[in-house]
Amino acid sequence: MKRKISSIFLILAGVSCVAMAAGNKPVSYPDGYRQWQHVKSMIIQQGHPLHGAFGGIHHLYANRAAVAGYAKGTFPDGAVIVFDLLEANEADHAIVEGARKVVGVMHRDAKRWAATGGWGFEGFAGDSATNRVVGGNAATACFECHRPRAADQFVFSRTRP
């Protein structure tokens, strides 16, 4: 019985240490990202397989390190890519931006986030810089979709010539 309790205690202590370590590695909200280089925009409409999670207007932004990564094909540590997702509303025969749904962030640090391809992932709900929607679930919430893009350092987007 003592052995079982000791084993359970060690497992719980290990889980707590892992959780604390993960808590020390949050991806920061990218203040001023809309002043960074705009990479691309797109609209995911009804009928697209990702519409449920990502339907709306997307704008992608890159900091200087990420811009260099797009140019070289290799993203250095410190590269940050922001996925700004807004509702797509129709008005007067035009598709216009509605409320912000989420600000998704990929932050490159090969050592810090080795388990997720060298990228830290986070999503911030709506216009909040503090309401995190990914947290400790980056491996399943984000990286599983990015995993097939290993040859491109797990990045889907490309810059236009």
Model-based region annotation:
Residues 8-17:
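Bacterial N-terminal signal peptides
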Residues 1-7:
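Positively charged n-region of N-terminal signal peptides that target proteins for export
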Residues 17-23:
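Sec/Tat signal peptide C-region and signal peptidase I cleavage site
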